[in-house]
């Protein structure tokens, strides 16, 4: 069953199935689909999934011998319509809109994948680089203004998600129950999809 950290924000239209861990302050926006029914999906602290993101896994072991799971480190931004399959995304990465990251690929910390890019199976993207295209190719190293811009974008997206989810949930039974539990000192996520029994956890997931 999915495990959602108490401070995560999950949009009501998102679908979460199987062995999925969603860490604290993660934002999962409208129409996202996260499937951990073949292998696990781990989404760590403060990562943001924009609208229509699709995350899935393949059932087999990767060529590297590793389990074919999806792992997102802290503070990852997945823009609209991104698709991930059994890959690793490092801390502070940005994946541009409509991009595809294939199974076995690894995007290392602080890297940027341009929009409409395809990172092929088992491709390694080194730290702090910009890659783009189909297939994705090296463009340049990430510059300081780009890094600062991404930090500001993340802050803005997090605030927008919190306000939007609160606005649409204010009068729902799920939200009022959530508020009541918080007042009682119990932990709960702001919203959990009612289609699943979601276990709330208060521990960090280590790779």
What are these regions (language model features)?
Residues 22, 40, 137:
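Short, electropositive, low-hydrophobicity segments enriched in small/polar residues
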Residues 28, 36:
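Conserved H-X4-D acyltransferase segment
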Residues 16, 30-32:
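N-terminal beta-strand/beta-hairpin edge segment
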Residues 1-25, 194-207:
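Extended, small-residue-rich solenoid/repeat segments and analogous flexible loops
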Residues 3, 37, 45, 51-74, ...:
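Glycine-rich hexapeptide-repeat left-handed beta-helix
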């Amino acid at each position: 069953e999915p495990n959602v950290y108490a401070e995560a924000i999950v949009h009501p239209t998102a679908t979460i199935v199987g062995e999925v861990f969603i860490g604290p302050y993660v934002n999962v926006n409208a129409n996202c689909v996260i499937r951990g029914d073949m292998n696990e999906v781990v989404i760590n602290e403060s990562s943001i999934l924009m609208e229509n993101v699709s995350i899935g896994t393949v059932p087999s072991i990767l060529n590297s011998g590793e389990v074919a799971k999806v792992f997102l480190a802290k503070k990852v931004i997945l823009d609209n319509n991104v698709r991930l399959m059994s890959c690793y995304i490092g801390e502070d990465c940005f994946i541009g809109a409509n991009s595809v990251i294939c199974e076995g690929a690894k995007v290392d910390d602080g890297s940027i994948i341009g929009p409409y890019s395809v990172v092929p199976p088992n491709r390694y993207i080194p730290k702090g680089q910009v890659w783009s295209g189909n297939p994705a190719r090296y463009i340049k190293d990430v510059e300081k203004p780009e890094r600062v811009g991404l930090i500001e974008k993340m802050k803005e997206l997090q605030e927008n998600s919190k306000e939007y989810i609160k606005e649409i949930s204010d009068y729902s039974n799920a939200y009022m129950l959530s508020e009541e539990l918080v007042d009682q000192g119990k932990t709960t996520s702001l919203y959990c999809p009612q289609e699943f029994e979601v276990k709330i956890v208060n521990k960090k997931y280590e790779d």
